[in-house]
């Protein structure tokens, strides 16, 4: 899976499409057709799933977890994490460890 191998990088749609020898527009259309999601949504969801694992299984700081999954800006990482999970990374880490 290309996303699994490249999610830590600034992995663009163009690079993903090139990896499978498709035009980016056509690749995007196929992704949407077969997954119901855009490339950006798939990448974001994959990154957040990895972040959740790291938050639960390590003592890494939130900003470091964000960097490990491809987000250089800690505020942007927190915003995206909250959009996907409904809570901030700190809230997620605290709730999961309490429960």
Language model region names:
Residues 1, 5, 10, 33-72, ...:
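Terminal helix-turn-helix DNA-binding modules in bacterial transcription factors
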Residues 79-99:
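…primarily DNA-binding HTH/wHTH and HhH modules…
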